[in-house]
């Protein structure tokens, strides 16, 4: 038993050395947010990353909690092509849940476990300037990222804080916009030239014929979309990954957040547990 523990530490050592001082942007969502054990393991993983010299930045989602709050308030959520229609009242609820509830819970849990987290949203210091998303028809106040101003993040990171970001952006008109958390995380990772972007999902990664694909280049990932291998909700995640890698992010990892300590297993082991997308070494 003892030698197993030593071997785990020795396997992690080269990765700890390689990533010391590097920035990781982590999108927290899916099963990892819903299951208590996975949620606790996520917090522990973040603390451990921090204490090994990595600079974690968290971007979180919260779709199910938003829908739950709407129902409690007697409002039926409306979706169009899988995207939430966000009118003025819905946007108020989105902001209340993401910024006022989920964000603060994550910050509190990190701080209770020995970290130093600060919660912000995309509106703070104009971190995320948004504009209306029209790709899927008129969804109301659903936005896409127009610009990221990462100065506030640099200030927090340099002062040893862990930024926790709710993906609510601000438009040029001063209005709040609901932004997809994967997209927000990818754009923030680009702006920070992060070493890694880690997307927590409800599946093991990118699958082909039921088998996990451990590594992909952006070109291979694109072909999987074209060939219909990557479908449904995985398409925007893979598109985010391709875009991030092509714009300066070292690697993107798509992993199952429902697995306890998924981040550590992916980052600090040779085999990993999910799909890594990065440019080919050649």
Curated annotation (Swiss-Prot):
The lineage of its organism: Bacteria, Thermotogati, Thermotogota, Thermotogae, Thermotogales. Substrate binds at residues 62-63, 84, 178. Pathway: Amino-acid biosynthesis; L-arginine biosynthesis; N(2)-acetyl-L-ornithine from L-glutamate: step 2/4. One of its GO terms (biological process) is arginine biosynthetic process via ornithine. It is found in: Cytoplasm. Keywords: Amino-acid biosynthesis, Arginine biosynthesis, ATP-binding, Cytoplasm, Kinase, Nucleotide-binding, Transferase. Gene3D superfamilies: Acetylglutamate kinase-like (3.40.1160.10). Catalyzes the ATP-dependent phosphorylation of N-acetyl-L-glutamate. Its EC number is 2.7.2.8. This is Acetylglutamate kinase. Belongs to the acetylglutamate kinase family. ArgB subfamily. The record marks 27, 237 as: Transition state stabilizer. GO terms for molecular function: acetylglutamate kinase activity; ATP binding. It catalyses: N-acetyl-L-glutamate + ATP = N-acetyl-L-glutamyl 5-phosphate + ADP. GO terms for cellular component: cytoplasm. Transmembrane segments: none annotated.
